[in-house]
Amino acid sequence: GMYPLIQILAAKGYELSGSDVLDGSIIRYEREMGVKVSLGHNADNVVGADMVVYSAAISKDNVELNAAASYGIPTVERSVLLGYVSRLYKQSICVSGTHGKTTTTSMITTALELAGRDPSAVIGGKLPLINGYGKAGKGDDIVIEACEFAETFLKLTPYLSVVLNIDNDHLDYYGSMGELKFAFKRFALMTQFMIFANADDKNTMDVMYTLDRRVRTFAIDNHGDYRAVNINEYKPGFFEFDLKEWNTTDTTRIRLSVPGRHNIYNALAMCAVCRFVGLSADCLLYTSDAADE
């Protein structure tokens, strides 16, 4: 939703106003941040605004959008604003993939937070550690869940990007797997520094092999720069593994507190990103508060 973006922009000193049809705790929090929130949509609400941002749930004939058009005020969809926010930070970490985005974004945010880097975050699920769907930190990092629906992730400017997997999803929009893979290719090409990719996912690697970009891989079965070895189910449905890194013979034992073997891949992506940005191996142990997807 809009709330994490409001948190971030308010913290950076932007003057914000908005409207909603329902009152609640979120609106109370927004007002406490200094945001002027009106209940109900009204043409007068947009007077004086430099830009109007709307969510995908807002119809094109909304009275405020019509008023903005008549006043010559630019209007942009939320994903465009998210792209702008991604460029406000020195290091934007954008997590993409058909499955596992929320979990991995939460894991990376958790590790950075507990390492004292005070990241900002925009997450598709609620993260208990920060008691919300995002946060406005004071550090140089922002962690963003990058959704492929309707190509919204192509509005982002990742410094580092993650591609967890590419599976049959949103084909009603893309029309074919080929077009979906092409969208992920465009996302990867927008990455400014490093891409982290799942070497066990064929569709992901099909895309990576076409790129002239820096790529680090993570894997269980295939060769990867970051691998999970000595996997053990320490209690029903919960796994632990040794993290083997490309540049050292040392390993780190990682125990997951979120269930499911698939979360090994999400944890590997977290480990790869966090080690790359300079976190110690000990910091990778803190995944217990990550939200599951």
Q: What label would you give each PLM region?
A:
Residues 258-269:
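Short glycine/threonine-rich catalytic loop with a Thr-x-Gly-x-Asp
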Residues 16-19, 121, 217:
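Short beta-strand "acidic-cap" motif of Rossmann-like dinucleotide-binding folds
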Residues 8-11, 28-31, 45, 56, ...:
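Phosphate-binding loop of NTP-binding sites
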Residues 1-6:
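Glycine-rich adenosine-cofactor-binding loop
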